[in-house]
Amino acid sequence: MPNTVHSGQFNLSSQALVIWHGPAPRADMEEKLKTFIEEGGLVLFLPDDTAHGTRRQFLGVSWGAMETAPADEYFRVESWDRQRGFLRDGTDQTPIPANRLRAIRRKPLAGKYRVLASWDDGTCALGQVRAGAGSALFLTTLPKYSWSNLADGHLLLPLLQRMADRGAERFSSAISLRVNDHA
């Protein structure tokens, strides 16, 4: 959702997941997203692609200034929670291939959040803030090849599938099953 759109143009009550790319939402859109999350919705925040950090926060989290990996090197995801959460292993114990994520650029998070995945230098790659029945997740890189290989889907696709599934639980558990769960 672009920051230039007025919140009155969106009805989030029928949505399971929102993907937000860019600076933190302002005023009425910020309140609308907070309510959406508190009612069980999920929002994935992606940083903007500018070099500077963001002053505005959402649920106490903002992005710092862009960092660039040294020449011929990458930031690599090294650890993530394989037991629970959005990046957990499948029911057959097959891990999400999050360690295939490579980034040239990233924007570190500032604020208080739970780390779901870390880069090889120990900084957060994916953070989570819970609010009410839902959550906001914050990625520190973009699915653009000038930033990372996130668009390859090794981490992003299972993350989005599981977030959409979890967000849909707020509507009716009778019509929604988690990926890899048996009916």
Q: What do these predicted ranges mean?
A:
Residues 1-183:
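A conserved amphipathic helix/loop scaffold
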